[in-house]
Amino acid sequence: MKKITLATIVLLLAANMAVWHAVYTENQRKELTVAFLDIGQGDAIFIEAPNGNQVIVDGGPNSKILHELGKLMPWYDKTIDMIIVTNPDKDHIAGFADILKRYKVSYLIESGTQNKSLIHNAVQELAREKGVEKVTARRGMEIFLDEESDNQVVLTVLFPDKDVSKEKPNDGSIVMRLKYGETEVMLMGDAPISVEKHILSFTEAKLGARSDIAATGPKESNARSGQELLDTELESDILKIGHHGSKTSTSEEFVRAVNPSYAVISSGKENKYGHPHEETLVTLAKFSQFPLKILRTDEAGTIVMKSDGKNFVQAK
């Protein structure tokens, strides 16, 4: 029997990595992936554009996010282009401490609301140590995840539209809409009904900055009227329900404006808050004839949605 030398093993491993990288890249190239991660009572959303750019919206309450990411990312991938903290409460930010230790992160987008907790301070300090560029979200900011594909992938910030440093975390929660071709996802964070009404009432406010993680960072874009925003940037295929299905979010008026085919609720099994609340489920049931499909992480685990730019399909 021939001896297998260390050099041979190294070459085989390198070849194997190259093959799997090529397969993975080819599989990802044509689709947008949006995965609502099963991390218990909290929020964590993994987004991967067709060109491979990756964003995580909220990090969940603990290190479980690492396990869930391991199912979606190849083991050799140690970079994440951007993390977004919709609000600084523990159930949205704690997992980012582990992310920052394990992955190279380029950008951190945050709402600007304050939290003096130890975990929030730890995440902020890690971001500083790792040289992560921090940006405060404002309405009109456009984050271009993919400008190379036939259909651009862009995240548009709908809220906040002001300094929210003195607001409660939920009242300043980031709200965004993700668009790829003809498909959209509305991401609500923990935004309460008052923020939903504020978004619905946009009339004359101007939109502001644009940010492109694939290129040179923040840069200005043309301003558009709030009415144009209302008309064109609310309807979405998927509505990520605000605040884990709490009755303090998800008004009938807002659901009607978004007109989703899927409503996704991220909450933990038998959580102490009783999320999702019955009132929210009753509201969503009013739209079942459209039809509206309700998906819950506490029932289904991690929910993976794929878009080809024309339609979303559930992969899991």
Question: How would you describe each model-predicted region?
Answer:
Residues 2-316:
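Non-globular, low-confidence helical/coil segments that flank catalytic cores
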